[in-house]
Amino acid sequence: MLIIELLKAIFFGIIEGITEWLPVSSTGHLILVQEFIRLNQDKAFIEMFNIVIQLGAIIAVMLIYFERLNPFQPGKTAREVQLTWQLWLKVVIACIPSILIAVPLDNWFEAHFYFMVPIAIALIVYGIAFIWIEKRNAQQEPAVTELARMSYKTAFFIGCFQVLSIVPGTSRSGATILGAIILGTSRTVAADFTFFLAIPTMFGYSGLKAVKFFLDGHHLDFAQVLILLVASLTAFVVSLLAIRFLTDYVKKHDFTIFGKYRIVLGSLLLIYSFFKFVF
């Protein structure tokens, strides 16, 4: 029944809206949830769905940060306009590694890593990394506390960290936040740049998935279009709340709790995978 599929779409949209911005892997969570709750659709649509519903989350970022990201915003001074263009240039530079590495390798990683065990391992590894980095930085002051002071070189290397998210379970936001902190930015700068970098990255990735879906000879029926729209709209609404939460959270807390969550979840998934294999 279509109503059941739409309820599932709402549920997946909630998962996407929350996990896209928290450093816990949205794609990984969608794959995991679909181990137990699946859309009654073909595999090609589900693979495309898992990526394209990110558009709702991206539109939420664009809405929240529209004035800050818009160089033509009325009332901006010449200096503010210059800083906005510089920010966009940093974002473009940070996209280069993904264009050169992640895009060509995407199909290979999708074929070999979109399974429970690789996701669980990635969750645990990056969970440990978050805890270790936060402990290492506990007594250190970040070198970059304003986005305007972040160099183009730092932006490029943050983009290199983003490439790591090609492995499901890594988390795009987790990889870029972790990379930015390692490179000396404050948590606030790391989170902000992660939000901004998501706009071209996820628009491009979603677009590529959609184009590939149609070039492979697939098409969307009315029910599938409705499922995508409902899931994306849900992801948009939930993302508005998740982004506000994370921006407020990082002002007072570190990312250790997310590291612990990743380790616990990854460990449970390894146990589940073991028993599923044995029995």
From Swiss-Prot:
The chain crosses the membrane at residues 2-22, 44-64, 85-105, 113-133, 163-183, 188-208, 223-243, 255-275. GO terms for molecular function: undecaprenyl-diphosphatase activity. It is a multi-pass membrane protein. GO terms for cellular component: plasma membrane. It catalyses: di-trans,octa-cis-undecaprenyl diphosphate + H2O = di-trans,octa-cis-undecaprenyl phosphate + phosphate + H(+). PANTHER family: UNDECAPRENYL-DIPHOSPHATASE (PTHR30622:SF3). This is Undecaprenyl-diphosphatase. The gene is uppP.
